[in-house]
């Protein structure tokens, strides 16, 4: 059995780390499309094509269930994939819904009509493509009413993180938070809508202030995945080996990933 985890680069490792801790008995195959990262500046058709190609590669590794641990892919490609492309014996899941369920205090799989929730003013920090897709607002509307979402495209943050430039990443985060707060001075909650951003969570929190609740995705996705596999064990695939695949240079990606997770990670060429 194996589950696939896909990201355009290294950000999905934050999700992988959480799901491995939650489900230590499950092998995970991680696919990073580092050669084409970042996705956040690409158009929807390009993101769709790249995400489909990566998903097929994970299916070939015996992963019948693939987690898109990439908000840009979840926002720009997932709905189209589910409507027209994914075969009936496979599943591809995104990372938005567990986050929204936590924000709206709904149980996993609660499909009751949308209702009023306590949080009325939400700041969304995401890549330009995720912001342009309005996928977060669309998913939120299925579950809650009366919530004002102010979205801030965070250009450059993913590139800085992928390049290991923490000083630049912190400066960019502060700049983007300042830009959002000019439009929404008092958000109650902030969504880190990119799986790279948990690495900058302390910077986001400091810039936003202690009164703002910051929601990060990794642990929420891990809990949701555990629940999903308990309900749908038939989608645990036939793969038996955990591995890391990349379209980039395996040595370079391995070194960055090792710094990222602070444990030795070895990528193979996809």
From Swiss-Prot:
Functional pathway: Cell wall biogenesis; peptidoglycan biosynthesis
Q: List its EC numbers.
A: 5.1.1.3
GO MF terms here are: glutamate racemase activity
Reactions accelerated catalytically: L-glutamate = D-glutamate
Q: Which residues bind substrate?
A: 7-8, 39-40, 71-72, 195-196
Name the active site residues. Answer: 70, 194
Against Gene3D superfamilies, the record matches this protein to:
3.40.50.1860
GO BP terms in the entry: cell wall organization; peptidoglycan biosynthetic process; regulation of cell shape
Swiss-Prot/TrEMBL keywords = Cell shape, Cell wall biogenesis/degradation, Isomerase, Peptidoglycan synthesis
The organism's superkingdom is given as: Bacteria
Q: Which InterPro entries match?
A: Asp/Glu/hydantoin_racemase (IPR015942), Asp/Glu_race (IPR001920), Asp/Glu_racemase_AS_1 (IPR018187), Glu_race (IPR004391)
Family indicated by similarity:
Belongs to the aspartate/glutamate racemases family.
Q: Which PANTHER family match?
A: GLUTAMATE RACEMASE
Role noted for this protein: Provides the (R)-glutamate required for cell wall biosynthesis.
Could you tell me what this protein is called?
Answer: Glutamate racemase
UniProt source species:
Cereibacter sphaeroides (strain ATCC 17025 / ATH 2.4.3)
Which gene underlies this protein?
Answer: murI
